[in-house]
Amino acid sequence: EDAKIDKLLGLTSGVIMIVGPTGSGKSSTMYTLVRELLSDRTNLITLEDPVEYHIKGATQVQINEKVGLTFASGLRSILRQDPDIIMIGELRDQETASIAVQASITGHLVVSTLHTNSSASTITRLEDMGIESYLIADSVIGVIAQRLVRRLCPFCKKPKQATRRSEEHTSELQSPACIS
């Protein structure tokens, strides 16, 4: 799995989406990925609402809709700065998604999050946002879907003998995910 992510991070253009439900750690994963990508020669610019973590060596832009700085307008401005990598806190609307896809096709690496429950639903969600399927196929280079596993209360949890079905299910969960 690490090798697949390393291969993905070795690409210089395309869209990498981190997806999952609210509170699943998408932002943490996104920050980890862009930190891995950052080097002295990399021009990394982020668009965030809000800026959650400081990234040394990156230019981070806070969205401020009161003064007209939206994800879409910020992304248009960022493209004039010739970034190598663009991190967008979340693809929320058609205009931002469309600009992000175009940026990736013209040689930029775009990393963003999207609220969907699976990798497959990411494609449907982008289509629902008005992105043509051929553009999705041309731009999306990877989708990382995740969700957090709940922790049991140490005082309330009770040991239970695993059934054959639960063991099979657990081994399926531990098999490598598809990242292509």
Predicted regions, residues:
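Short, flexible helix-loop junctions that flank or precede catalytic/ligand sites
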Residues: 1-167, 171
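Positively charged, low-complexity/disordered segments
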Residues: 168-180
